[in-house]
Amino acid sequence: MIQDIYPMKLDNAFQMKEPDADSRILAFRDRTVYLKNEGEITFLKYHVWVEYCKTHHKKVPGLVYLFSVDDISFYLTELYEDVEIPGFMYHKLFAVRSMKPKERVFAATTAWHLYVWYRDNQFCGRCAHPLVHSRTERMLQCPVCNNMVFPKIAPAVIIGLTNNDQIMMTKYAGREYKRYALIAGFTEIGETAEETVHREVMEEVGLKVKNIRYYKSQPWGFDSNLLMGFFCDLAEEGEIRLEEEELDRKSTRLNSSHMSESRMP
């Protein structure tokens, strides 16, 4: 799972701290992240960024502390439009998923989660005044009406629907991700995670389920989610009826679950 980076550990505690020379700098543009990928991810170091700015007679932009991975601190900033640092470029987040090492993939996706929150919450949704960063916790606050805005975390489920030795595999229709995937979806207002499992399976493939069992969860910063994994069994045989705006009819089916991981579609 994406958070499995042991023996390293992500420390997400809020801090007001200054960067050191080896702190890592993360910047995003659309759904891309600025890094070097030569066999493994290399993030921009703070001292390299400072030297670049000095050499090009530019002011070092402001930084926001994000988190640490072991003893390395990560910061968010905005790069200049014309920045050119040898080996570095903007990479699509979709491509980062398959890069190495795992702890840097996890760092990039978690940083993206926070970046989207900061980007989308510059003004108060109640009175429209600019929000300011709290100095005591990870929170944005309106100085006029005192509205407080915390990071967005959207609960969602991912479902292993089984029938004897088979498991339901789907393919999304018209999306960048082309590989097989389990049924998944967001939890709605007034709904438990277990009720989400029932609803999502019915909506996406038209089947009833039983014996819902919680498995594990994982943070999914790509879409600001907390993904909760469940297994469940097919309650009764029935025709698969696809939500065709979401799923590819030709590719969604029950597949053998006793296949080795390397043979799974």
Please give the residue ranges for each predicted region:
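N-terminal alpha-helical interaction blocks
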Residues: 1-101
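Cys/His-rich short segments
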Residues: 110-160
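Single conserved hydrophobic/aromatic residue that forms the stacking wall/gate
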Residues: 254-265
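C-terminal hydrophobic structural anchor segments
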Residues: 223-251
